[in-house]
Regions:
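Hydrophobic membrane-targeting segments
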Residues: 1-44
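Membrane-interfacial hairpin junctions
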Residues: 3, 137-139, 145-150
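Residue-level signature of catalytic and energy-coupling elements of molecular machines
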Residues: 9, 23, 60, 75, ...
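Alpha-helical transmembrane segments of integral membrane proteins
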Residues: 12-25, 112-119, 165-169
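Hydrophobic alpha-helical transmembrane segments of integral membrane proteins
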Residues: 15, 111-119, 144, 148-155, ...
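Predominantly long cytosolic amphipathic alpha-helical stalk/bundle segments
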Residues: 38-124, 128-142, 172-200
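Hydrophobic alpha-helical transmembrane segments of polytopic membrane proteins
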Residues: 153-171
Length: 200
């Protein structure tokens, strides 16, 4: 660990934990939310090319049966409930879609907490450092200006670290949440398109 880490006080340890947790979530979500893992390009093309009747339905059904993407899961749900009335099928698929959205958003709440709590932890570290500095001044006097400056520097390390953890976490949270929204909208479009063609 660099020397400045230990100079920042006890708040640096929870900030280190926040940074590790935040980075792990960001990397995992970026990997999991790749478009190819959520929406298979082949399945997209099959749905777009699917006629109102004929073997196009069977091609989509056959491909989705072995497709491990999230869209494939939704499409299988549509076909699994195809014997139902359209509104019943829609309700069943919507219930599954809510579970899928929850999976896509996994970890984002924790990432939001990291972004919100890190500056507060930094501020706590700074406040505790300033209290320690004032206690030292009250007991030993002002001393050398360099000593006072060093004490203030050490107190501010925690705030700087808290912001350094919070800002990337906040940006990543906003980006990942927006990515989930766009992927969900796209999957909704393909699902609605399939439902419309199945129930013509």
């Amino acid at each position: 660990m660099p020397q400045w880490f230990f100079q920042g006080g006890v708040a640096m340890y929870p900030l280190l934990l926040c940074s590790v947790v935040g980075l792990a979530i960001i990397l995992e979500r970026i990997w999991s939310l790749r478009r190819s893992r959520v929406i298979a390009p082949t399945l997209e093309k099959l749905i777009d090319a699917m006629p109102a009747s004929g073997d196009g339905h069977e091609k989509v059904k056959a491909f989705s049966g072995g497709d491990r993407t999230v869209l494939g899961e939704l499409i299988r749900a549509v076909f699994n409930h195809a014997a139902m009335a359209k509104h019943e099928n829609v309700e069943a698929v919507q219930a599954i879609a809510r579970q899928i959205v929850g999976r896509l958003e996994r970890g984002l709440t924790t990432l939001s907490i990291v972004a919100e709590i890190s500056p507060l932890l930094g501020l706590l570290g700074t406040c505790s450092g300033m209290v320690k500095l004032f206690v030292d001044v009250s007991q030993h006097g002002l001393g050398e200006p360099a000593q006072i400056s060093r004490g203030i520097f050490e107190a501010l390390i925690a705030t700087v670290t808290g912001l350094a953890v919070a800002i990337p976490a906040l940006v990543a949270h906003m980006y990942l949440r927006r990515r989930v929204e766009l992927l969900v909208l796209e999957m909704e479009r393909y699902t609605n398109e399939l439902l419309a063609r199945l129930y013509r």
